Each structure stands twice: as C-alpha cells, then as structure tokens.
Amino acid sequence: MNLSPREKDKLLVSMAAMVARRRLERGVKLNHPEAIALISDFIVEGARDGRTVAELMQAGAEVITREQCMDGIAEMIHDIQVEATFPDGTKLVTVHQPIR
C-alpha cells in the first residue's frame, strides 16, 4: 500500500483519536496530543459526512470537556486548525477555544 505523506498524517491522527476514545471510555484524562487528535478526527470525519465548515466550527468545541483533560490542557489549546476534505473541495476549519 503506497500512501502519500498527507494520507499517512490522516491515518496517524485517526489512530491517535482511537487511542484517545479508548482512554476516555476507561475514565483516563486526555493529554495534549490526544485532545488535539480527537477533535481533529471529529472534524475530518464530519467533513466526509457532508457537514458544513460552520457546523464543524461549532460542534468541534463540544467534542470534549475540560473535565475530560489533564489539568492545564484546555488553557494550552487556543485554536485548532484542520484541513478537511468536503464534497466541494478542501477547506481549513478553525475551532476557537475547543475545550470548554
């Protein structure tokens, strides 16, 4: 299987998000990379499902809560920007204050 660098990045984020989901199910608080991966994966998959940029900007801030993250993680993440493929092309989705 020959994957482009972009496809490898997407696969890595998806795998990290899967690990984060498992940890949340066990009650383990997320660290910085896990929180970023989980929100990023939500945005990429939402774009594939046909959701709009505006919907994903709003919903991306509701994926995880402050209580689901280690102390200080919410303050470390001011914005998350994800390049996602929508039915009409690739767009940049920005989520401001993604962990509330």
Swiss-Prot record:
What do the Gene Ontology cellular component annotations say? cytoplasm
Q: Which InterPro entries match?
A: Urease_gamma, Urease_gamma/gamma-beta_su, Urease_gamma_sf, Urease_subunit
Q: Which UniProt keywords apply?
A: Cytoplasm, Hydrolase
What pathway or pathways are given for this protein in its record?
A: Nitrogen metabolism; urea degradation; CO(2) and NH(3) from urea (urease route): step 1/1
Which SUPFAM superfamilies does the entry mention?
Urease, gamma-subunit
> PANTHER family, alphabetically?
UREASE
Give the multimer and partner information.
Heterotrimer of UreA (gamma), UreB (beta) and UreC (alpha) subunits. Three heterotrimers associate to form the active enzyme.
This chain's protein is named: Urease subunit gamma
The species is Rhodopseudomonas palustris (strain HaA2)
